[in-house]
A protein has these predicted regions:
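A generic structural signal for beta-strand entry/edge sites
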Residues: 24-26, 42-46, 82-86
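Charge-rich, low-complexity N-terminal segments
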Residues: 1-35, 68-80
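The feature represents the first ordered module of a protein
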Residues: 28-59
Length: 118
């Protein structure tokens, strides 16, 4: 993994005030009310968020509300796994920790509005 990506991941974890973890190609962190998965893909980062204790979700409603302008034009993939609603994006190569942080905040806000998280 590229040193710059490693440093950006460390900075993202600090910005989100998450517990320190060993940086690797795939990181999954659970800190209520959200789950976060970071996957390094070449020089890019796949950032995925979900509510840990989602009471229910409406995939159709989430898909309707998933508008590009909500995420500054960055396409989001909305999907479910075992009744959990996830939102995921492959970040552009030039994104840094602060841009990842803002995207993560937007994903969390989106999920909270749908599912009643914080």
């Amino acid at each position: 993994m590229d040193l710059q990506i490693t440093r950006n991941i460390e900075q993202l974890i600090a910005l989100l005030r998450l517990p320190e973890v060993q940086v690797s190609d795939i990181i999954e962190i659970h800190q209520k009310p959200f789950g976060l998965k970071l996957e390094v893909q070449g020089a890019r980062l796949m950032l995925t968020s979900w509510l840990l204790e989602s009471k229910s979700h409406d995939l159709d409603n989430a898909l309707k509300r998933n508008q590009p302008e909500r995420f500054n034009g960055l396409p989001q993939r909305i999907f479910t796994i075992k009744s959990q609603l996830f939102v995921s994006a492959l970040c552009p190569e030039q994104f840094d920790a602060h841009q990842w942080f803002r995207l993560c905040q937007k994903q969390r806000q989106f999920l909270s509005q749908l599912g009643g998280g914080e």
